[in-house]
């Protein structure tokens, strides 16, 4: 069993804002020109659409309007917790497995929040699991979560 990726940051904003930025403003901070299906195909994505509710979909909108399903929201507890099944593959490759991404938001005061992102279920990828975890997502979350998301929260 492969250990999950766990990333912990503190952001200088309220718990409510930290949650809303992560879920409802995702396409304002996610690096659309680097960490998207479209970017793997050579062009930045236009947008990310999040249907913010349990069972809602997270969808990338490509430059030509093509939609790529990133995952489905499994748990949705506004301001506290958000989880989704998650994976996207290069253009033309079938997505046959998904990880579980869980994000927990804990208030540390009026203007400070701890945000913990955990990505698990690597076993679903079989032989590719360690490579995806260590060289793919493990490195990407540094730029996406610790960099872009934290900056969007004012950090």
Feature roles, as predicted:
Residues 39-46, 150-155:
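Short, highly charged C-terminal tails/helix-capping segments
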Residues 34, 107, 116, 145-152:
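Short, contiguous alpha-helical
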Residues 6, 45, 101, 132-136:
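Alpha-helical scaffold segments that form or flank carboxylate-/histidine-based iron centers
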Residues 16, 80, 147:
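Glycine-centered loop/turn positions within well-structured domains
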Residues 49, 54, 59-112, 120:
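Hydrophobic-ligand binding "helix-grip"
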Residues 1-44:
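Hydrophobic ligand-binding cavity/cleft-lining segments
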Residues 18-22, 58, 73, 84, ...:
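Hydrophobic pocket/interface hotspot
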Residues 120-155:
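A conserved amphipathic terminal alpha-helix motif
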């Amino acid at each position: 069993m492969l250990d999950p990726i766990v990333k912990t940051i503190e952001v200088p904003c309220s718990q409510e804002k930290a949650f809303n930025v992560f879920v409802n403003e995702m396409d304002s901070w996610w690096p659309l020109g680097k960490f998207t299906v479209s970017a793997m195909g050579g062009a930045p994505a236009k947008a990310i659409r999040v249907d913010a509710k349990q069972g809602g979909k997270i969808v990338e909108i490509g430059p030509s309007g093509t939609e790529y399903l990133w995952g489905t929201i499994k748990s949705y507890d506004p301001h506290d917790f958000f989880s989704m099944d998650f994976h996207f593959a290069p253009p033309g490759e079938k997505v046959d497995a998904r990880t579980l991404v869980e994000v927990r938001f804990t208030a540390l005061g009026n203007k400070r929040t701890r945000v913990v992102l955990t990505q698990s279920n690597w076993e679903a990828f079989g032989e590719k699991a360690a490579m995806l975890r260590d060289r793919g997502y493990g490195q990407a979350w540094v730029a996406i979560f610790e960099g872009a998301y934290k900056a969007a929260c004012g950090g």
